[in-house]
Structures are given as C-alpha cells and as structure tokens.
C-alpha cells in the first residue's frame, strides 16, 4: 500500500499528480519527552515498527530526532534529540513519532517563498485509489527552509544543558553549526564546533520572570556570552535579580534567521531567591 501525491498552490484551481510515496512506520509516545539532548522512552500504537532501523531520522511534531536504539519487545526507543535544523523541545505523551527516513513522497515542483502549497495523499490499495475529493488536505507555507542557517548546538548555561536552576553570573555557551558542511551524518547537539557557515552571527535574548524581554545581544560571532548578576539586577527593574529567566538563541545570516531557536527557561537561586527550594546549594 502506498499513495499518489497531488498538490497545488492556494491560487491554483486544480490539483496535479506530482509523484508517489510510501507510508512510513509510526508510533505514539507512551511517556513525555523532556527538553534534553538524549531521551529513552516507550511507545504504543505502533505500525510497521519492525521496518525502523537505527541510524535513521524521525519527526516528533516539528523536531527531528535520530533513532539510536529500538527494542520492539520492550517497546522502547533511544533518541538523539534536535538534529538537522531543529532543537530539542518538550513533547507530551500521545505525541506521534513518524519514522520518515526513506519513506518520503517528493514533489519536484518549484515554489516561491511565501506561497502556500496544498497537498493530498491518495491511498493506493489492491482495491483501487482514494478519490481526490475524499482526501484530506495538508498545507505548508514555503519559508526557504533549505537556505536558512542551522541554529547553534550544544547550548549550555553555566556548563549545564537545559538547567532547572542557575546561580550567579550566567555564562551562556554554544557550538557553531554549518548546514553546508553537515551533509554526511546527523550531528548530535553535544558535538563541538562545525563551521560556522560564512556570515552567520547569533542573537541572544534574555527574558525576565514576568516574561518581558530584558536584554538583547546581536551580531555575536563567538560561542559564549556572559550575563552578570549585576546585569540581571539592573535589567529586572525589581531591585534584585529575576527569580526566573528564559533565554532565546538563534542564528542569523544577513537577515536570514534559523528555522528554529533555542528557548531555555530556568529558575534563579541564591541571594534569597527560592531559598526554600535550594537551601544548601544547587
């Protein structure tokens, strides 16, 4: 069983067949996934899971992951998170994972940035092909994804990836990535510098405990930025450091922004902040 791929732009009146594709294996996450660089989880509701091989990629919502281990007896998966041009984010139980590697249907048409393409998949079985009018429409806005710089990797706050809490001055660090060089294998978040792609800089934003933007660093070319406790106190407007912060980090190449950005939230400890939770240290 496979499908015929039909598509058209929003402005077009008729769908045209573009090619064929194979349905990919899929499953549902039985547990939540935290924002982390590696995850081990269990799954249920699987379909064709025996076709999944290690070393292949899959999608969970908008995040691309690398399958590094799979056990169909225990229904467990180990995943390297946030590969290609994506970053790790949290996922709820019941999120679907699509093991798409090798099962793509390809539309060879060229579309302009900003166009919206509508696609319909017509299931093909031994009994016939689904009618075009009966197929569900999926829409995708063209956003020049292939041309966007990769977001930085290995993001850490005081040398910790995705901390729950941080104390004192903040050293936010990361590693370069290069979409033009990363063409052989899927690179984990934890890898060291690759590149960077020529012309890429980084933008770092700091948000305070109420969610308001407090400071922006632009045009960064290195792999770290310090945000001192004095900076935090001055920016907060509270006469003290923020009790919680969120940082955003993205890549920028002459106004072309990475598809995704890192967004990391954490509490602050010390100086009377969350004393009941972190008394004795963190």
Feature map (PLM): residue ranges:
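Leucine-centric amphipathic alpha-helical interface motifs
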Residues: 18, 24, 30, 98-113, ...
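An aromatic-rich alpha-helical recognition segment common to small helix-rich domains
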Residues: 139-142, 152, 174, 204, ...
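Recognizes extended acidic, P/S/T-rich segments that occur
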Residues: 104-110, 184-242
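Beta-strand-rich modules
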Residues: 113-132, 229-260
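Surface-exposed loop/edge segments in extracytoplasmic proteins
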Residues: 12-19, 65, 207-218, 257-260
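Pro/Thr/Ser/Gly-rich low-complexity, intrinsically disordered linker/stalk tracts
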Residues: 133-185, 191, 254-282
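Autoprocessing Asn-cyclization modules and mimics
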Residues: 1-81, 86, 138
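Small/polar beta-strand repeat architecture
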Residues: 66-143
């Amino acid at each position: 069983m496979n499908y015929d791929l039909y598509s058209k732009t929003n402005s077009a009146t008729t769908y045209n067949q573009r090619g064929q594709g194979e349905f990919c294996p899929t499953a549902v996450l039985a547990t939540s996934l935290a924002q982390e660089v590696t995850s081990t989880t269990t799954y249920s509701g699987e379909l064709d899971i025996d076709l999944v091989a290690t070393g292949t990629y899959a999608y969970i919502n908008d995040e691309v992951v690398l399958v590094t281990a799979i056990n169909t007896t225990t229904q467990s998966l180990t995943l390297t998170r946030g590969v290609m041009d994506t970053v790790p984010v949290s996922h709820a139980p019941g999120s679907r994972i699509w093991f798409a590697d090798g099962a793509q249907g390809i539309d060879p048409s060229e579309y302009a940035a900003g166009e919206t393409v509508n696609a319909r998949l017509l299931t093909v079985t031994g009994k016939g092909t689904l009618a075009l009018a009966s197929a569900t429409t999926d829409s995708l806005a063209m956003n020049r994804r292939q041309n966007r710089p990769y977001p930085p990797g290995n993001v850490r706050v005081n040398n910790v990836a995705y901390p729950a809490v941080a104390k004192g001055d903040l050293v936010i660090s990361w590693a370069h990535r290069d979409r033009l060089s990363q063409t052989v294998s899927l690179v984990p978040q934890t890898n060291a510098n690759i590149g960077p792609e020529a012309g890429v800089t980084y933008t770092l934003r700091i948000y305070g405990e109420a969610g308001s933007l407090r400071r922006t660093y632009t045009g960064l070319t290195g792999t770290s930025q310090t945000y001192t406790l004095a900076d935090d106190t001055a920016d907060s407007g509270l006469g003290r450091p923020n009790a919680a912060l969120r940082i955003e980090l993205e890549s920028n190449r002459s106004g072309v922004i990475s598809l995704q950005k890192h967004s990391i939230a954490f509490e602050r400890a010390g100086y009377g902040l969350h004393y009941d939770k972190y008394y004795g240290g963190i």
